[in-house]
Amino acid sequence: MYTSIYQNSYVVFIISLIVLLIIFYVFKIGYSTVVVNGKVEKRFNWKYPLAISLVIWVIWYFLLYPPSDVNINSSKQVGGTETSTIGDIVGSGVRQQKINMDNWL
């Protein structure tokens, strides 16, 4: 589990997006130039801060604090002791797959 709120990659994504939006807006970084009625105007562009925040999220989520692997066979079940299984259709040639349906509700 998380020991700090900053280990949650989604929190870091939101914080980095807000901070980058403020920085890009205040310092007028990445403004797009638009011609309206013969006048050249610079408008705020939110795409660059979003792209940088997504890169930060990917690094945070997959490299710094990757999700732990879940083993289905050893996971604690919430419902009863029996598990519902969905098998293969006879003659279909598809291997049998066990799906834990107890925790789906």
UniProtKB/Swiss-Prot annotation:
The chain crosses the membrane at residues 10-30, 48-68. It comes from the Viruses. It is found in: Membrane. One of its GO terms (cellular component) is membrane. It is a multi-pass membrane protein. Keywords: Membrane, Transmembrane, Transmembrane helix. The keyword Transmembrane applies. This is Uncharacterized protein L416. It comes from Acanthamoeba polyphaga mimivirus (APMV). The lineage of its organism: Viruses, Varidnaviria, Bamfordvirae, Nucleocytoviricota, Megaviricetes.
